[in-house]
Curated annotation (Swiss-Prot):
Keywords, ordered alphabetically: Amidation, Cleavage on pair of basic residues, Hormone, Lipoprotein, Secreted, Signal
Family: Belongs to the motilin family.
Keyword Oxidoreductase assigned: no
Lipidation (O-decanoyl serine): 29
Designated gene of the protein: ghrl
Organism whose genome encodes this protein: Anguilla japonica (Japanese eel)
Descriptive protein name: Ghrelin
List of residues that carry Valine amide: 47
Gene Ontology molecular function: any one: growth hormone-releasing hormone activity
GO CC aspect terms: extracellular space
Amino acid sequence: MRQMKRTAYIILLVCVLALWMDSVQAGSSFLSPSQRPQGKDKKPPRVGRRDSDGILDLFMRPPLQDEDIRHITFNTPFEIGITMTEELFQQYGEVMQKIMQDLLMDTPAKE
């Protein structure tokens, strides 16, 4: 009886480990780039400004009014949309304008 109980526990343990190993998906791939599966859609990284104040700043500031928010859209061969407050626009507007000019200007051909 005791041997049967031990065998049942071992079988249960093996099944649980097999299911666990099947569901684990981590580690690095040892496949060459040509052997890796193609077509996996990766999510683009989330880019945003990180304040030193962190999350507490979100709760301390008053709610934004519609007139405080400015949305800017650039249409070229691609579309860029940026939404920011008037305060952030005043602070970073010139830098954004410079970045957009650098992106949209024709680059000279390399010889």
